[in-house]
Amino acid sequence: MTHLRRSTSPEWWPVERKGAPWSIKPSPGPHPANSSIPLAVLLRDVFHYAKTLREARLIIGKGYVKVDGKVRRDYKYPVGLMDVIELTPINEYYRIIPDPVNFLRPIRIDKSEAGVKVCRIEDKTMVKAGKIQLNLHDGRNIIVDQDEGRKYETLGSVVVNLEDGKLMDYYPMQPNQYVIAFNGVNVGRHGTLINWVRSFRKRDAIATVKAKDSEFRTVLNYLLVIGKESPVVKVTE
């Protein structure tokens, strides 16, 4: 099916439910459909830089919108967690962050920060020539030497240079790291990871995070490491 009923689209999408019966179904891409938003919806219903889908498609088709430094002409392209959006005609830059109200939302960032992205390591696999492939949350795959690859652990985060794809830094998932929740009832809350209760699967462990206002608990799999003592990228206005 190429269309999606508005009534069944994710609740956090800012689309009018009582309007036209159909919405935009995200194209297959780096983020799951239930945790991403089509580029045209972002442009029309979030940024309000287009009044209609036709206008949004025209803007996108002309190559005026970049995602993670690359021009995207597919109006259905799925935009998700930590993606960097660039609106080239007006030199505006945004990062998609977790939000307690809207699940995901863009925040304005400086051009100096638009060239980096924090990505979580979802898996590690051995590939040819003794190399290790890091599989990141946004579908990105990065090949590293075996010796270097040993230091990277799943659920840890890497800082990626969007211009050349190289790794700039690494933050393991461990106590005293700065994390942000991107799913669950605490989505959008962030703070210092205190510890977690051991479980058979590390991803299922219950973690305790010390936020600015209070502590909260969530599944370890719902956390993204975004720095050591503080975030390395902007996550608040």
Curated annotation (Swiss-Prot):
GO biological process, one term: translation
InterPro entries per the UniProt record, alphabetical: Rib_uL2_dom2 (IPR014722), Ribosomal_eS4 (IPR000876), Ribosomal_eS4_central_region (IPR013845), Ribosomal_eS4_central_sf (IPR038237), Ribosomal_eS4_KOW (IPR041982), Ribosomal_eS4_N (IPR013843), S4_RNA-bd (IPR002942), S4_RNA-bd_sf (IPR036986)
rRNA-binding recorded as keyword: yes
Keyword list, A-Z: Ribonucleoprotein, Ribosomal protein, RNA-binding, rRNA-binding
The keyword Ribosomal protein is assigned to this record: yes
One annotated Gene Ontology cellular component of this protein: cytosolic small ribosomal subunit
Molecular-function annotations in GO: rRNA binding; structural constituent of ribosome
Domain S4 RNA-binding: 37-100
HAMAP family tied to this protein: Ribosomal_eS4
NCBIfam families linked: PRK04313.1
Similarity comment text for this entry: Belongs to the eukaryotic ribosomal protein eS4 family.
Protein name listed in UniProt: Small ribosomal subunit protein eS4
Native species: Caldivirga maquilingensis (strain ATCC 700844 / DSM 13496 / JCM 10307 / IC-167)
Lineage: Archaea, Thermoproteota, Thermoprotei, Thermoproteales, Thermoproteaceae
